[in-house]
Amino acid sequence: MTSIKEQAAISRLLSFLQEWDNAGKVARSHILDKFIETNQGKTAPELEQEFSQGASLFLVRLTTSLRITYMTDSCLEKLLRSIGIFLSAVSSNRYLIEFLEVGGVLTLLEILGLEKIKEEAKKESVKLLQVIANSGRTYKELICESYGVRSIAEFLAKSKSEETQEEVQVLLDSLVHGNPKYQNQVYKGLIALLPCESPKAQQLSLQTLRTAQPIIGTTHPSIVDCVLKVLGTMHLEVQYEAIELIKDLVGYDVRQALLKGLVALLIPSVKEISKLQAKILSDPSVLQLTPSLPMFLQQAAAAKAIGVLARNDMSIAEELLYLRVVRGLMAAMGNTDHSNSQRLASLTLECFVQMFPLVAEHVRKCMGEELYQLFLSNAEDLYMKIDSIQADILAANTVNVTKALCLHGSSYSMNTLYGSRDSAQMAYLTHFEEDVESKE
């Protein structure tokens, strides 16, 4: 026999459920407002007490309403927030299972792909997916098995709200942790985002890739080209994240490909330059846009990245010498169409000149005494002081430090400046020299 108190509670619950069932759009909106206000942050036992051990009866009504109305955006944000109260409650595993059993994950992912749904509702959908993903490995796998990575990545690329995009980053970060079965899928999805048009999405993808790379261990072959292309961005915050990722990636098996790619960007291809010249001849206004052309932005960013890498690791600096980085930097210094390339290349060349006496000798010989002294006195402002003839000399230089390094041995500069290397490092460099010599 139930007590009078219990009967009264059950009666209140039935009355509430009947009110919901009979309510129209406006009335349901008010019910949801009140539910959110009074139940935010409650635990599962507290929700059960509130609903006389029948909380699931209201949850099933919320999920049913969600499935029926989500395409019309009717009270969608409030519905999602209300469901979130159940799913995020402490000890709410039962509610989570009930939601998933009726296809909750697929509904949330579909919401992300619908253009007519408001951004705020999509953000709430992402938050629910976060709750599900944070509930354990099984739930992360369920999201991935529902083509979730693709849906989430596409939404990140298309979203117009930076706040929402940051919520998506949190979700992707969760999916890459503790998800060995599908972590590679998430990793590839992040790489696929790099060419997208949204600077914020690029920035967040690069940040998450830095977190994901140590978890994945191996690198995907496409990551090198994708990251190098991102260097052509006009957005400094994206460029910064790309360089930070490059700093991490040189510790993996793509190191040589990355270094070669960076050096190659210092001298734009003849094909690209010919395209630019053709555009200028047909439309002189293109001249005004040259500072923002991707190939020049890449050139400047590559010079900057090379400087960062060389200052951080002497062995990388020496590898770059074998890739003829000095020639590339001097060529960039002669690019009068892009002053930032000239400035950054000059600063990076200064670093190599200070680190390697042999480089200083070759640079001095190529520049001539007058230009070299100008360079030493203020490398950063050199581009403002050189004339067209000096710029042409720099752009057309044929400096080749590689042969001289091989003749003198890798210890020529480094032993003089920094003392002897350990045997493992010397063995690595000897192998690197032999590889270069075989290609000469």
From Swiss-Prot:
A single GO cellular-component term on record:
cytosol
Looking up Gene3D superfamilies in the UniProt record yields: Leucine-rich Repeat Variant (1.25.10.10)
Q: Check the record and name the Pfam families matching this protein.
A: DUF5578
| Source organism superkingdom | Eukaryota
Q: Which PANTHER family match?
A: ARMADILLO-LIKE HELICAL DOMAIN CONTAINING PROTEIN 1
What's the protein called, per UniProt?
Armadillo-like helical domain containing protein 1
Give the originating organism.
Homo sapiens (Human)
Name of the coding gene: ARMH1
